[in-house]
Amino acid sequence: RQATCPVLKSAMGNCYLYWSVNSSLEMVRSMIIDSHESEPDPVNAIEKVLIHRQALPSSLLVLWSSLKEKGFELKGDAELVAAFPQLQLVKDEEWGTPYLTKTVTFKLVDSLESAIAWINQYSSSHADSIVTESYQESRQFALGVNSASIYINTSPRFSRHSSRGETVFLGMSNQKGRRRGFISLETLTTVKHIIQGNGRF
């Protein structure tokens, strides 16, 4: 607020995942675990999971058991905690706050539209994910969620070094404009165009 020069704000944590009805339990499990293994910090860690109301209770129990074995702390909204007392009750202010620890909170939603609205209200808006078998759902999510990066059926895990080894990433920006998304050394520079002619047009 008191900066006298342009500021490029980076974001960390509080990334959301929407688990669509009838989509892969194993993919959800793998994406959550992998996202928390970012180096050196959990920049894109999935900390909040929105679950379609029609999800099978047995699938939830399998997921939670697996995450518990990996050392995760699990929380849920009031509806989930009432049905599954092993979950800790989430506080309202936590929906918009990053944990930056191995903590994941779960919430039931009625539809994809509800999930998109919730994510746009509470997410850090730099990396959000969806697991779905529907191309239409994936497109609706990608176009509807106001985040710098959208991950469809793939882990949002952050790595300082790109897979091609050409770029070093310093973080993720959720600011709107051309400096949104991955922050690299190139992001911190600008360009200058020099046009030379011989007087002919």
Spans of model-derived segments:
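ALDH superfamily catalytic-core signature
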Residues: 1-98
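Short, solvent-exposed amphipathic alpha-helical segments in soluble enzyme
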Residues: 2-5, 64-69, 120-124, 144-147, ...
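Residues at or immediately preceding the N-termini of alpha-helices
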Residues: 25, 111-112, 135
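Flexible, glycine/charged-enriched surface loops at secondary-structure junctions
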Residues: 40-46, 73-79, 127-133, 151-155, ...
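Short, well-ordered beta-strand elements within core beta-sheets of diverse protein domains
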Residues: 50-51, 101-110, 125-130
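Conserved glycine-rich beta-strand-loop-beta hairpin in the small C-terminal domain of fold type I
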Residues: 96-103, 122-126, 148-149
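C-terminal segments
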Residues: 133-201
